[in-house]
Amino acid sequence: MVAPIEFLPNEYGYVILCVFYAMFVTIHLGINVGKARKKYNVPYPNMYSEKENIFNCIQRAHQNTLEQLPTFLVCLLMVGVAYPKYAAICGVVYVTSRYNYAWGYYTGDPKKRLNGEYGVAGFLGLMVGLLYVGIKQLGCCDMYLPF
């Protein structure tokens, strides 16, 4: 069977599914902010509440995810062209960590957001992969990585 986008490796489907997973998580975190706005009476366009710290934690979990999303997606999509399984694994680790990060933050104790700190491993893996792909694309590196 021919892949829908022929110039991409067939395994790039894993990367595409990881992008869908990231979209799902980001939307879910946004829905949680919307629910918290109603519960804690924080009207638009206010980003934060002066009285409700728990709302601020819920909002911050979503905002931080949005801040990192563009860099994450660029790394995921670029590395995925050369190493789709590696990129998807790193991506799933990172995206899953965003749930743990958010749920820790939702307790109202910002230190508990560190429950999702393992996501740094996935993000760092993508950053190193992007550097490697860039160097290899320039023909400056004959080093082989087994992924």
Where do the language-model regions lie?
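Interfacial loop-to-transmembrane junctions
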Residues: 100-125
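Core segments of transmembrane alpha-helices
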Residues: 63-76
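Long, highly hydrophobic alpha-helical transmembrane signal-anchor segments
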Residues: 1-23, 137, 147
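Transmembrane alpha-helical segments that form the membrane-embedded catalytic/substrate-channel core
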Residues: 23-38, 95-104
